[in-house]
Amino acid sequence: MSSSAAEAREALATAVSVTADTLSVDLSDGRTVAVPLSWFPRRVHGTRAERDDWSLVGGGLGIHWPALDEDVSVEGLLVGRMSGESPQSLERWLQQRRVAG
């Protein structure tokens, strides 16, 4: 395992902040990682309340947004992994939101 992979596995999320264009995650080792919100289309389409409704999972290994049905791992953020959701899956999710709304 590379040292960067080991660091990613050891870093835990402690706090999350979502602005109109950025997802920021504070880590247990003192770092803050910030990525464009556009990396995660469900959060882009979510309301402020939905974006702010998150919980840490796995003791801080990841973050879950229940209303957006999305999870992000700290490791993924640290290696620059964007959402892997297909455009078709995102469109189905958006359609379900329109029907429910």
Where do the protein language model's features map onto the residues?
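Motif-centric detector for short Cys/His coordination patterns
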Residues: M1-G101
